[in-house]
A protein has these predicted regions:
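Residues at or immediately preceding the N-termini of alpha-helices
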Residues: 27-28, 61-63, 77
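Short arginine-rich
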Residues: 70-85
Length: 111
């Protein structure tokens, strides 16, 4: 039986001044989609250039992931930063560590 994972993730911009929380079943694909949309300018991540992964957690069920996303979205920045710091104390951008080359060169080959 195929076991899917569902991810809750938090992105930031280069200066770490904004936080974006999302949910997906394919973490790499979704972050690349945020990156591709950077020139559109209509989404939150495009407007604030939030493509850098600081935090993620996996869930077995989509309902749990969605509930967790909503929970985190309801938090103040300070509480989100506490969660991020527990997971990623150096506040490193995790894109390259998890996905290899970042930003992606050949986006079309990865989608």
């Amino acid at each position: 039986m195929l076991h899917r994972k569902f991810y809750v993730y938090i992105l930031t911009n280069q200066n770490k001044t904004v936080l974006y929380t999302g949910v997906t079943n394919d973490l790499e694909q979704r972050i690349i989609e945020h990156w591709i949309g950077r020139t559109a300018g209509t989404s939150f991540t495009a407007k604030y250039k939030a493509y850098y992964l600081l935090f993620y957690e996996a869930h077995k069920y989509i309902n749990d992931a969605i509930a967790r996303e909503k929970e985190i979205k309801g938090w103040r920045r300070e509480k989100k930063m506490t969660l991020i710091n527990q997971f990623n104390p150096e506040l490193n951008f995790l894109n390259k560590e998890l996905f290899g080359e970042w930003p992606p060169d050949e986006v079309t080959n990865r989608l």
